[in-house]
Amino acid sequence: MIAAAGVANRILGFVNAPTLLQKVVAKCIREKTDLTYYNRNRETLYEGLRQCGFSCIKPQGAFYLFVKSPIEDEKAFCEAAKRYNILLVPGSSFGCPGYVRIAYCVAYETIIGALPRFQELAKQYFQR
């Protein structure tokens, strides 16, 4: 019975947020977001991937970008990327088969550190 009440409470929480949460959101809604952080990450990752030979869709407002898989099986490409400690998500999970998705809402240093690994990954698929 207690478990059922807990589930009902969580479900109702989605319908009617707790008062404290409503007050916090009301204050945050007026706050400005500094987008320069995300813009720098987007530009660095986008340009870095293009220099490696990857074809990318430049996002206009998202915190992730889609990269064209260099092979037909984007899931196999995601697996290959893991060998370089790169985590990609198959685009088919988001209705974009043939692409992989990568988020850039991470520390700038993480993106800078990942670019050499993307270069190594690209060597498997592109002739220079």
What are these regions (language model features)?
Residues 1-128:
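PLP-dependent class I/II
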